[in-house]
Amino acid sequence: MAQVKRIRRNVSGIILLDKPLGFTSNAALQKVRWLLNAEKAGHTGSLDPLATGVLPLCFGEATKFSQYLLDSDKGYETLAQLGKTTTTADAEGEVLQERPVTVGQADIEAVLPKFRGQISQIPPMYSALKRDGQPLYKLARAGEVVEREPRSVTIARLELLAFEGDTARLAVDCSKGTYIRTLVEDIGEQLGCGAYVAELRRTQAGPFTLAQTVTLEELEAVHAEGGNEAVDRFLMPSDSGLQDWPLLQFSEASAFYWLNGQPVRAPDAPKFGMVRVQDHNGRFIGIGEVSEDGRIAPRRLIRSE
């Protein structure tokens, strides 16, 4: 007997998941996608299985804007285990070296300023970056080590929240592409004792914070009671991650031409940059970019939500 193909729903929006410990970002995405029975889904950048916290999941039309969330600044809290280094720079790796921890809180406070502002990082081998089409973590598992180019990242905030014996809890606000494992490892080397990430929790992704998230258990409970459609109540609008962008509202005529790919003028447009656009009814219809001639060129358009 032929298997009946499941008909997925055309739903759009963003669910802010508090990613559970032990899940890959994709596994978490596929679980929530199943709960929604959503046709199209994508996440906004991977969190390691060891990490928990803010993971924006995009569905339907919202997937068109996931790159802009991927490029946004992030916030983390991490627990650094001092005195050891591991193969992966976190608790999942094998211990490479152990050294005595002779530093105190004042020593840690003294080195942190060196890692604030614009710094250079060498990405870890255990990362999703690719070399000749192969993820670095696969090469690392095969015992290979390849040269990685340093990358410039910005640490806007680096604060010691607590220090106890051989652990330090840190708060980090950083630019996209920052590896917290590398940051902790580099701090450990500066202290002379080594360190790895024992815990990692993302507290912010772009405009989104932990206070806005929902747990997988909460989603499952709602689904058990009301099915796929009951989970829809957790969907945020597709432009939720773009709330700090300038907002323009087009007339009915301008919206018509713009949705058909034509740049249009808007009296309140900024002189440059990206903008969110609503139609005359206040419905989000996409994002545009201000051209040199002042017109708004369409960049990503959405269907009616």
From Swiss-Prot:
<dbReference type="GO" id="GO:0160148">
    <property type="term" value="F:tRNA pseudouridine(55) synthase activity"/>
</dbReference>
<keyword id="KW-0819">tRNA processing</keyword>
<dbReference type="GO" id="GO:0031119">
    <property type="term" value="P:tRNA pseudouridine synthesis"/>
</dbReference>
<dbReference type="InterPro" id="IPR014780">
    <property type="entry name" value="tRNA_psdUridine_synth_TruB"/>
</dbReference>
<dbReference type="GO" id="GO:1990481">
    <property type="term" value="P:mRNA pseudouridine synthesis"/>
</dbReference>
<dbReference type="InterPro" id="IPR015947">
    <property type="entry name" value="PUA-like_sf"/>
</dbReference>
<protein>
    <recommendedName>
        <fullName>tRNA pseudouridine synthase B</fullName>
        <ecNumber>5.4.99.25</ecNumber>
    </recommendedName>
</protein>
<keyword id="KW-0413">Isomerase</keyword>
<dbReference type="GO" id="GO:0003723">
    <property type="term" value="F:RNA binding"/>
</dbReference>
<dbReference type="InterPro" id="IPR036974">
    <property type="entry name" value="PUA_sf"/>
</dbReference>
<dbReference type="Pfam" id="PF09157">
    <property type="entry name" value="TruB-C_2"/>
</dbReference>
<dbReference type="InterPro" id="IPR020103">
    <property type="entry name" value="PsdUridine_synth_cat_dom_sf"/>
</dbReference>
<dbReference type="InterPro" id="IPR032819">
    <property type="entry name" value="TruB_C"/>
</dbReference>
<dbReference type="Pfam" id="PF16198">
    <property type="entry name" value="TruB_C_2"/>
</dbReference>
<comment type="similarity">
    <text>Belongs to the pseudouridine synthase TruB family. Type 1 subfamily.</text>
</comment>
<feature type="active site" description="Nucleophile">
    <location>
        <position position="48"/>
    </location>
</feature>
<dbReference type="Pfam" id="PF01509">
    <property type="entry name" value="TruB_N"/>
</dbReference>
<dbReference type="InterPro" id="IPR002501">
    <property type="entry name" value="PsdUridine_synth_N"/>
</dbReference>
<dbReference type="InterPro" id="IPR015240">
    <property type="entry name" value="tRNA_sdUridine_synth_fam1_C"/>
</dbReference>
<comment type="function">
    <text>Responsible for synthesis of pseudouridine from uracil-55 in the psi GC loop of transfer RNAs.</text>
</comment>
